[in-house]
């Protein structure tokens, strides 16, 4: 195959920044959601660590999402993207990304009130994990569905995005677990 016919991806810095930060934030929310939904009740100051991780993930996701506006042609019209959620992966990603902040904030309030082990906290945490997974999958589908970029139209795109989010979100989770075990 002729080299001239191969199209390479040359994403803008804002796309890389968005993908990295938001992926890490949503990945951390996925891990936290799974840990709280299916793990043992928090002990000692563990709930405080979870609160800090929830906030850290929220900041990473929010900054990443704001970075996504940098590569829009007309950022002031970004709100219109939400109206196309039935047909657009970009719109679905936006709706789900914003929806993730609702259970994250609710979980933060439950943990702050000392209710980190009750059924409500576990249900909200499970919802956060599911919404986080769905958001990352929608992000991947944006690139997997772009016909002009053949590199994105590969069966490994969605699993790759999910794996990247879980790995980058898992790093702060592992660090926190290390501090918890040492303390």
Please describe what each predicted stretch is.
Residues 3-58, 62:
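N-terminal signal-anchor module of multipass membrane proteins
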Residues 6, 13, 18-23, 40, ...:
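Long, contiguous internal "core" modules enriched in hydrophobic/ aromatic residues
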Residues 27, 31, 66, 72-75, ...:
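Alpha-helical transmembrane segments of polytopic integral membrane proteins
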Residues 34, 45-103:
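Membrane helical hairpin/interfacial module
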